[in-house]
């Protein structure tokens, strides 16, 4: 049998691959690596290993679910940072085992369940395990809401962090200027911060470096920038959301998220989680702007309020569920109205829990009747309940 592990970014997938290689190679277990940036020869060899069963574990990005990938016997599919994938993508991985009516076991992991996932954990066939405590040595992150007008104060705070030998993330919603959106971009912010911090020195006397990271950079350049930041040679990293997952720098103690009102709750929580990984007190600054409007929208205010009030991923998900809705259970939308015909997720919890307990008995004792019931109400869309 084979296992597959799919991660949303190459940075995270490669971290998993290197760690698993170290654990599994001594046991004689072969691990294959699949990503969109592989050279043709390397990719052909990996695909052959997957198809003939030589690769017992396959680690990769979205490349794992492409049509050319054929598993011999997929028994377990692991999806890391599950909230970053769409319903169709998760189904595509599950459908990689198609013979004899069998389906692979699925393990989905996330620090921030999206509305659909949280609702599915309540009402679908999804068992949930929760780790609700910080790892040893971690400190809770303080979250502050700061108006864009106080931007200079945030830069002063960065200077203080640099003087203490700490490192800082600054996240922007765009890579470059957009004619459609009046938002700060990573390229300009990198230029501005480089100028503002050009004379700042770290405790060892070296001038503070300000780096830039975004998805359009060549893979080698991205690796070079990330290595410099991880090794502590770079004090400030200006980035887009490519650092949302898979980046672990214990010395980073300040996260600044620009135009925080434009980000979703799960994304904000994931970005905040890039700091607070060491023993130093850490903070997340949510810079917000109302633009031409007199105030933020109700949903934006609700998101920022949730971030300032809790660090709990499941509580964040519950707030997100209230704000956005659970999405379609029998479709691909992951937020919005549930579109249930009779039930109401908020008011019928007790009845739905009872139905969930009784359903296995009905399926076991009256399979023909249950099949008719499923066909009538689900209309051939039951596959969506598995993702």
Residue ranges and their predicted role:
Residues 1-305, 365-369, 387:
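Inter-lobe coupling/hinge segments of SF2-like helicase ATPases
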Residues 291-387:
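C-terminal accessory region of SF2 helicases/translocases
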């Amino acid at each position: 049998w084979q296992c597959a592990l799919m991660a949303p970014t190459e940075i995270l997938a490669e971290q998993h691959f290197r760690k698993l290689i170290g654990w599994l190679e001594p046991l004689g277990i072969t691990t294959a690596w699949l990503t969109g940036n592989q050279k043709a020869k390397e990719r052909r060899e990996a695909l052959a290993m997957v198809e003939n069963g030589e690769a017992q574990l396959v680690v990769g990005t979205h490349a794992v679910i492409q049509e050319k990938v054929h598993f011999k016997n997929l028994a377990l599919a692991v999806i890391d940072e599950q909230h970053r994938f769409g319903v169709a993508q998760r189904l595509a991985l599950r459908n990689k085992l198609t013979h004899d009516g069998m389906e692979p076991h699925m393990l989905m992991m996330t620090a921030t369940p999206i509305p659909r996932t949280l609702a599915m954990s309540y009402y679908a066939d999804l068992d949930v395990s929760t780790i609700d405590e910080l790892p040893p040595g971690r400190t809770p992150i303080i979250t502050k809401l700061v108006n864009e007008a106080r931007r200079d104060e945030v830069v002063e705070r960065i200077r203080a962090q640099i003087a203490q030998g700490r490192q800082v993330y600054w996240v922007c919603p765009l890579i470059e200027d957009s004619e459609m959106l009046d938002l700060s971009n990573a390229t300009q912010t990198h230029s501005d911060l480089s100028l503002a911090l050009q004379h700042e020195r770290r405790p060892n006397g070296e001038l503070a470096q300000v780096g830039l990271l975004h998805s359009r950079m060549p893979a080698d350049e991205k690796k070079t920038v990330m290595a410099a930041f991880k090794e502590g040679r770079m004090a400030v990293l200006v980035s887009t959301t490519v650092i949302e997952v898979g980046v672990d720098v214990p010395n980073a103690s300040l996260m600044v998220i620009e135009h925080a009102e434009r980000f979703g709750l799960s994304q904000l929580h994931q970005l905040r989680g890039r700091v607070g990984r060491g023993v130093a007190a850490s903070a997340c600054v949510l810079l917000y702007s109302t633009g031409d409007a007199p105030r933020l929208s109700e949903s934006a205010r609700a998101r920022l309020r949730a971030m300032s009030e809790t660090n709990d991923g499941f509580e964040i998900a519950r707030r997100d569920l209230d704000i956005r809705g659970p999405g379609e259970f029998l479709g691909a939308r992951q937020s919005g109205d549930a579109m249930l015909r009779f039930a109401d997720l908020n008011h019928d919890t007790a009845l739905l829990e009872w139905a969930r307990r009784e359903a296995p008995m009905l399926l076991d004792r009256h399979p023909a009747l249950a099949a008719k019931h499923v066909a009538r109400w689900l209309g051939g869309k039951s596959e969506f309940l598995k993702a």
